[in-house]
Amino acid sequence: MRFTFRLFAVLIIITASGTQALAQDEAKQAQGGGDLRAAVQNPVGAMYSLPFKFTFDYGASNGEASFLNIQPVIPITVGDWNLINRLIVPLIDSPGEVTGLPSIPNPIPGDGATGLGDINYSLFISPAKPKGAIWGIGPSITIPSASDKELGSEKWSAGPTGVILFQPKWGTFGMLARHLGSFAGDSDRKDINQSLFEPFVNYNLPKGWYLISDIIITANWDLDSSDIWTVPLGGGVGKLFKIGSQAINARTEAYYNVVQPDNAPNWQWGFTLQFLFPK
C-alpha cells in the first residue's frame, strides 16, 4: 500500500509539471490536438499507449482496497484491419474478502494481502478505416497469475469481448462488453461466470480538457440474485498535456455504487496517467 501511494504521489507531480509545460506550448497543442484526443478516447484506436490506472475502493465492511493497473496497448495493423492488444496487469492491496470488484470475481476470506493479481489479455480486431460506427471484437482471457490466493481467482477464464463507439464533433460515446467463464484451475474455488458492461462518454472542452463518465457494471451470474449486480454512477474530468514531446493523458473520476452485493465498497475514486505514443 505504501508503495502504491508513493508512486501515485510521483505521478501527481509529473501531471502538475506537465500542466506548466503545456502553458508554454498551447499553440502547438491546439494544432492537431483534436485528432489526438479522439485517438485517446477510442479503445480500439491504432495508438501505442501505457496507462497507469489507480483505483481506491471505500466502504467495504472489512476495509479499503486499492489497485494499480498497468494497461499497455499495442496495436498491429494488418492490411485493412487493426489488431489491438490490450493487457491489464493489476497490483492489488486487499484487506481480505471484498465483493463487487471486477478483477476478483470469486473472493475468499482472509487477513488481506498485497501483490500481483490475475493478468487479463484482450485482442480486438477492428477496421483500420471505419466508416460511421467504430467497432472491435475478439477474445479475452484471464490468467491465474496472482501472487496470493486472496488477490486472484485461481481460475483460467476466457470469453468474448467487443466494443462499439461513435465520435461526433463534441466527443465520444460507446459501450465495451466482456464475458468470462472459467474452464480450468483450482476446483476448490468458485467458478467464474462474469459479464462486464462499460458504457462511456467523453465531452470535450477547450485546451485539452474533457468531462468523462466511464462506468464499469459487473454481473456475477452464479451468486445469489441480490448479489449479482454492481452498478456505479459518477464521472470525472481529464486533460491532455505534454512534457517536452511526450503526450500524456490524465484523468480523475469518482463513482458511487447504487447497486452492490453485500460487503462491497460504496465508493470508488480513481486517477489515470496515460503515456501516449502516436504512430
Describe the residue ranges of each PLM region.
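Cleavable N-terminal export/targeting peptides
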Residues: 1-33, 37
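Transmembrane beta-barrel domains of Gram-negative outer membranes and organellar outer membranes
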Residues: 24-279
